[in-house]
Each structure stands twice: as structure tokens, then as C-alpha cells.
């Protein structure tokens, strides 16, 4: 969390900026690593969630593998402490250039999402005289009970291979000379809060599909159940570290597996969301015909989640908290400066009486925040500030 003791230092900085609580990051990552060891589960960090080098390097130092979804993420992971043999490469659209780069690195596996992709990897590996480790991403048709834009495991989604192609895939893998099949991969969605019900169903479905592949003569040595554990956007201080215990224990108790099968998960948001805050400042207070607006200097170019998903982020007036003026609650629409009507941080938010220059915090912004920022309207990219460097 952002400590008020740091307010004086932070208030002198030009806004907007990303603030990262490194103590919370370390506590979160260490908790996940400790529980994973206890339950015998491997972890691959979903690199797409946050690519600040300091954050990524700490995660890699704790023994995590890397889950990548582009060639550049693969190269970035390798350059920031992840050994190639624990890097997996997913994504529905891998280019030849990306595949060749990953083959040259000797990554752990390609998580393949189509028959054509497997044929291409087989051909490119043959040209290099190597064998590519591949895992088949399965679309298990499971509703993750989350936002439709981050649901990835239904037949209507573009991800993974559905059951009607299982036999085709199995025959391909038996005959491909340059593919080494190692296992099955699943990922059904993101920001999953119905943890026991959703993941227990995923585990049961995964075991059924493993049985089918093995009945057709393909040994499944690895089961990757993906990521998706949600965080508490409503009360980040009350629940700063996500419930890894429930996630891991559900997998441990519900997934039927052999002692020699490797099981892994891919946390991303759950590791980094709560340690990050987008700090911004009130430029203007505008009293409209029907509502009051707080116009901030951070916009949807910095944090696109509210505009893209209608995502909720808790908003706090840091100056009011520091000065002890938390009475006089008023209702505001908190908006950004970008020339789009969707550039809204929150509508009808109850906040202390706010004035020009107040420092504001958009909480739980460490995941899918800075990585999705842009220079739309030619606005600057916000820098990062780390708690242990103040």
C-alpha cells in the first residue's frame, strides 16, 4: 500500500506516475512460492501482467518460470533471469520469426493452439534439425464466471483446441518427426473469484481429457492449468495478498494425477496487481449541470482497463487523507484528460471535498496497467517509482 509517511516525497514528484510497493510485491511472491512448494505445483509468471524489470527480476529470482505470449516476451524473460528451459510460449498467433527465436533459445515448450500451428512448428524445427517440445492448449468449454473480455475457455473463444479436433491432433503428434509432446495446457479466464467451483471443474475436465489422450497412446507428462486467480479491487488494503491457499489446495485435492506428472499454474495479476498504484493529480474541478467532475492528469492512455472493460479501481484522495480533511464527502465523476468520452476513472464516486492539486491514487493498478499504456493524444508514458527507492 502507499504509505502516508511518503506523502511529502511523492507530492513533489511530477504526475502521473506508477508507484510500486516492493515490500508487498515480495510478500506476495514469496507466499505464492512457499505454498507452491508445499503442494508440489510449478509456477510460471504471466509476463504480460507487468514487465517492470525490477518486478520481473524479483519474480525470476524466486524460482518461477515464465509464461509468454509473444516472441518479445520470450526474449525479455530470458534477459531478466528466467532460464530458457522454464519459459513456455503460448498465444494463438505466433509468427515464424517468433517461433524460430524460441527454437534457438531452447525454451521449455510451445503451448500450441491450432493444428496448423503445430504443423508450422514441426516444419521450422525440421529446418533447424531440432525437436520442439510442445504442449496442446485445450479449450475445455468452461465458464470462468468473469468478464466476457477475459473469458478464454469457452467454445466461442479463439483460444485452444476443442474436442472435435482431439483425434486429428493426436494423430499429428504421433507422426510428427520434430515435435516432442510433453503435455496439456489449459487457461479458462482471468480475475476468477469463484475459486473452488471454477478450478475444481477445470481439474475434473482436465483429468478426463488427459485420460482420453493417454487412451490413444500419448503419455501426458505435464498438466498446465493456466492462471486467472482474482484479486480484491474493492478492498486492496483488507486483502493485499490473494488467496493462493484456496487456489493451490483446490488443485491439489481435485486434480487426479500420477505421482510422476508435473502440474503447473500461471499467476500474473495475483502476483502484481495490489503492489501497484497509479498516482495522479487533480487538474481542475468542474461543476457541470448535473454533476461535479474531477479532471485528473492521468488518462486512459495510462490505464485503459476502466475504458476497455468497465473495470473498477478504488480511488483515494491522498492529500485529503494526509491533511486530515476527510469530512465533507461529495460525489464526483473522476475523469481523465484524453479526448474520449470513455476516459472515465469512476462515476458517482464518494470522495472528500477535493481541490486543484490534490494527489489521488488509483489502487490495484500493478497488473495490466503500465503494460497496456500508450501515447494516445501524444501523451507521455508515466514513469515508475519504487517504495524502496524513496
Residue locations for each model-derived region?
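A charged N-terminal "starter" segment
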Residues: 1-132, 171-180, 211, 215, ...
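Charged (often Lys/Glu-rich) extended helix/loop segments that serve as interaction or gating elements
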Residues: 4, 250-252, 260-390
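General structural feature for long, well-ordered alpha-helical segments within catalytic domains
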Residues: 21-24, 28-31, 51, 55, ...
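Active-site beta-loop-alpha junctions enriched in small/polar residues
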Residues: 23, 46-52, 69-72, 92, ...
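Structural preference for beta-strand elements that scaffold enzyme active sites
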Residues: 40-44, 63-65, 84-88, 109, ...
Amino acid at each position: 500500500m502507499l504509505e502516508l509517511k511518503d506523502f511529502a516525497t511523492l507530492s513533489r514528484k511530477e504526475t502521473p506516475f506508477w508507484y510500486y510497493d516492493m515490500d508487498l510485491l515480495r510478500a506476495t511472491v514469496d507466499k505464492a512460492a512457499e505454498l507452491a512448494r508445499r503442494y508440489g505445483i510449478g509456477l510460471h509468471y504471466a509476463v504480460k501482467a507487468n514487465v517492470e524489470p525490477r518486478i520481473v527480476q524479483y519474480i525470476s529470482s524466486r524460482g518461477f518460470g515464465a509464461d509468454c505470449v509473444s516472441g518479445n516476451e520470450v526474449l525479455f524473460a530470458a534477459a531478466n533471469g528466467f532460464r530458457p528451459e522454464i519459459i513456455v510460449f503460448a498465444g494463438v498467433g505466433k509468427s515464424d520469426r517468433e517461433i524460430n527465436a524460441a527454437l534457438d533459445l531452447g525454451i521449455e515448450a510451445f503451448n500450441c493452439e491450432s493444428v496448423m500451428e503445430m504443423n508450422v512448428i514441426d516444419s521450422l524445427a525440421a529446418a533447424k534439425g531440432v525437436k520442439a517440445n510442445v504442449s496442446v492448449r485445450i479449450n475445455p468449454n468452461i465458464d470462468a464466471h468473469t468478464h466476457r473480455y477475459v473469458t478464454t475457455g469457452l467454445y466461442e473463444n479463439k483460444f485452444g483446441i476443442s474436442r472435435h479436433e482431439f483425434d486429428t491432433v493426436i494423430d499429428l503428434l504421433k507422426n510428427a518427426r520434430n515435435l516432442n509432446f510433453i503435455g496439456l495446457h489449459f487457461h479458462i479466464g482471468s480475475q476468477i473469484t469463484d475459486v473452488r467451483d471454477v478450478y475444481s471443474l477445470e481439474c475434473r475436465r482436465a483429468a478426463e481429457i488427459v485420460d482420453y489422450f493417454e487412451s490413444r497412446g500419448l503419455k501426458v507428462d505435464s498438466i498446465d492449468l493456466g492462471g486467472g486467480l482474482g484479486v480484491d479491487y474493492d478492498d486492496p488494503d483488507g486483502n493485499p495478498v490473494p488467496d493462493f491457499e484456496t487456489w493451490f489446495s483446490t488443485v491439489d485435492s481435485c486434480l487426479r494425477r500420477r505421482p510422476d506428472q508435473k502440474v503447473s499454474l500461471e499467476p500474473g495479476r495475483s502476483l502484481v496487481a495490489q503492489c501497484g498504484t497509479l498516482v495522479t493529480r487533480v487538474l481542475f474541478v468542474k461543476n457541470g449541470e448535473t454533476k461535479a467532475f474531477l479532471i485528473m492528469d492521468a488518462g486512459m492512455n495510462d490505464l485503459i482497463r476502466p475504458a476497455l472493460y468497465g473495470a473498477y479501481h478504488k480511488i483515494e484522495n491522498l492529500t485529503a487523507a494526509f491533511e486530515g480533511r476527510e469530512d465533507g464527502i461529495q460525489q464526483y465523476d473522476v475523469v481523465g484528460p484524453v479526448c474520449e468520452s470513455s476516459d472515465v476513472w469512476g462515476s458517482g464516486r464518494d470522495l472528500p471535498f477535493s481541490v486543484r492539486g490534490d494527489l489521488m491514487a488509483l489502487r490495484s493498478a500493478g497488473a495490466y496497467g503500465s503494460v497496456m499504456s500508450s501515447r494516445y493524444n501524444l501523451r507521455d508514458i508515466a514513469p515508475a517509482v519504487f517504495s524502496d527507492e524513496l
